[in-house]
Regions:
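Short helix-capping/hinge SLiMs at alpha-helix to coil transitions
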Residues: 14, 27-31
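Short amphipathic alpha-helical interaction segments
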Residues: 45-58
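A short, conserved structural fragment
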Residues: 58-68
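Short, Lys/Arg-rich nucleic-acid/phosphate-binding segment
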Residues: 67-73, 77-79
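Conserved segment of winged-helix/HTH DNA-binding domains
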Residues: 77-101
Length: 101
């Protein structure tokens, strides 16, 4: 079975094509903390867009915010029940087949 709408670059886009999918994909693929600026650079989104999404995800407790020497870092909350699912979606790779194309 083929799923042409599922992107290997960002499988979350099939659920949400917006900034949320970009942020979740970055956080789901990385064990380290990222700043809003770093995520914005990696996704070609504005820092303010990314920051708004991160604030909402922190409120839901899916994402943790860590402050170190004036620098805010964000990462998935390992205790949240959706974290492993977010990681699994972020790591998803669809095998592309030319069969039947």
């Amino acid at each position: 079975m083929r799923f042409p709408h599922v992107s290997d670059d960002n499988p979350f886009k099939v659920l949400s094509p917006g900034v949320e999918s970009d942020v979740l994909c970055i956080l789901g693929r990385s064990p380290m903390e990222h700043s809003a600026s770093n995520i914005a650079d990696l996704t070609d989104r504005s820092r303010s867009q990314v920051h708004m999404v991160l604030q909402r995800l922190v409120q839901t407790e899916l994402v943790l915010r860590c402050v170190l020497e004036g620098w805010s870092g964000y990462r998935l909350n390992p205790q949240h029940p959706l974290t492993e699912h977010v990681k699994a979606i972020a790591q998803l790779r669809i095998t592309r087949s030319t069969e039947g194309a």
